[in-house]
């Protein structure tokens, strides 16, 4: 037997947990070893809200999964709109080109954050992770017109207007 190359297998948090449980059930490892095989950061991902993996849904745009979790709410294009909606008991997703410290109150008020710019180290990503809120950044197909309070998905006829219900998945 010749081994040419080895590497650590990459897997989702759910897959790592499932594998550890099954290996323990089969007697291949102890319960203690099973617990040690699941990274605490991965376990944290499983504690955030998630969409049903078997559900039918249409993905209209993709970006970087900057902070785990799922969110559903009315699209809002300013921090102020997110705060007002939260005060009225409405759930929102804050949609911005990118966030700044001025958007913090809106980020706190919103269920999740969606940006067309930025990455995993952007303001939106770092703050959302710190708050435990879902965030998707760098959605290139999302062209935002904050003044008109709407966003278009490039390559489609989809236009998201303020108040439209949207969802985002910061886990996958």
Tell me the role of every PLM-derived stretch.
Residues 1-60, 160-172:
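Terminal amphipathic helices with adjacent charged low-complexity linkers/tails
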Residues 26-28, 32-100, 112-113:
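Long, charge-dense accessory insertions within large macromolecular proteins
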Residues 2, 50, 71-81, 89-91, ...:
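Acidic, glycine-rich flexible loop/linker segments
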Residues 17-21, 32, 92, 126, ...:
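Predominant activation on well-ordered alpha-helical scaffold segments within soluble catalytic domains
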């Amino acid at each position: 037997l010749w081994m040419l190359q080895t590497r650590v297998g990459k897997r989702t948090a759910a897959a790592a947990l499932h594998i550890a449980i099954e290996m323990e059930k089969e007697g291949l490892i102890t319960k203690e070893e099973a617990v040690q095989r699941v990274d605490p950061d991965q376990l944290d991902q499983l504690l955030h809200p998630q969409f049903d993996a078997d559900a039918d849904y249409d993905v209209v745009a993709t970006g970087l999964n900057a902070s785990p979790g799922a969110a559903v709410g009315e699209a809002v294009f300013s921090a102020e709109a997110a705060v007002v909606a939260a005060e009225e008991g409405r759930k929102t997703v804050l949609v911005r080109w990118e966030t700044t410290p001025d958007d913090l109150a809106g980020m706190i008020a919103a269920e999740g954050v969606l940006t067309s710019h930025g990455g995993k180290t952007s303001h939106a990503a770092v703050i959302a992770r710190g708050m435990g809120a879902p965030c998707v950044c760098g959605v290139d197909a999302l062209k935002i017109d904050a003044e008109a309070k709407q966003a278009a998905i490039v390559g489609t006829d989809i236009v998201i207007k303020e108040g439209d219900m949207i969802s985002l998945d910061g886990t996958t």
